[in-house]
């Protein structure tokens, strides 16, 4: 017989050995991660992924690094006068310039200077700076360009298809040189575009080039080795067997000395980017990925725009057959291209037009365009879309509408698909030294040239993401 004392001792030991098995189990509390969506979204700002997929509030997307949302808002500022197919530039003095057709002396193209960069109130000024002793009065295609390396302002006028003249200023328009003649007798001159590249020329720090729609099955181009004072012969701006048609989007020069331009492919199908590495002596064709997107069937169907960032990466933008805006990039000077990305916001746009593209530092890019909202009323608004992490597999896109809901830039039927009021044939876009995007276009209902921009948003310059200095809201108050 087992003694009672031994039984009690055994039970006591069993109790101690099993007490931990039936006690309360400590559960580690899950600490919620802070959301990147920690700010309010303005009514006319949209955060989205490619193909108009809404991204707002999506914490499962693992947004990080440069691919994160930043507060953004868009607005515009009037130049106080009309414009037609406005081109623009920015000088090292932080002055914005826009062409203004017919508003200069003797009916010339005005070169309008605005001190908008860095404003804290709407007390800004815009005034014509083109006032030479003998102004060039007749201009069928007004065009200005600012050399991003030297700040030389180039005024480039076409005269009734018969010839072109070039004038330039090295002091923000205080004085003008020229005109020089930029014309060859063997071709008509139409739809010109001009740019400089960071290639040392014989008599000037940069090489200049222009291209035209002339008497050839593709654009003709000419280069200058002395900053635009004299010009070489107009030669093929594409492979000599190319049949792309002569209408070209804006020419652009690169940090590596290359020039690029975009238009229809040499077969007449799709869009291509054309590149010269030797100031126009020879050109190569680099087809864009338009097999799925198709190409626009509109007045400005040649508008396959191209731009380069500070590292020489190439960005292209075009309208597809569905009239939506598409983007592709190349990191090897156009040899290969990323898949096409549809960049419109998730707001049911029925179509877009007048595309322009600009790039800041490596991996940043912004797009300007006009768009029609679906509905019974024909309403055209202006938009800017950007990404700060362009080479991400799923880049976050941010789009702002520049005009208010009750302030459309036009209400004409199919405005974005045709030559429409002051929008003309094309628009223009640049990034200033601080990383703010500026988009030159026309507010057709008010008949004013306007600069569209982000009054709130991140900089497209610098290694890290920083916010721009906030600017006052412009809009109708500036018309």
Q: Predicted regions span which residues?
A:
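Secretory targeting signatures
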Residues: 1-35, 477-479
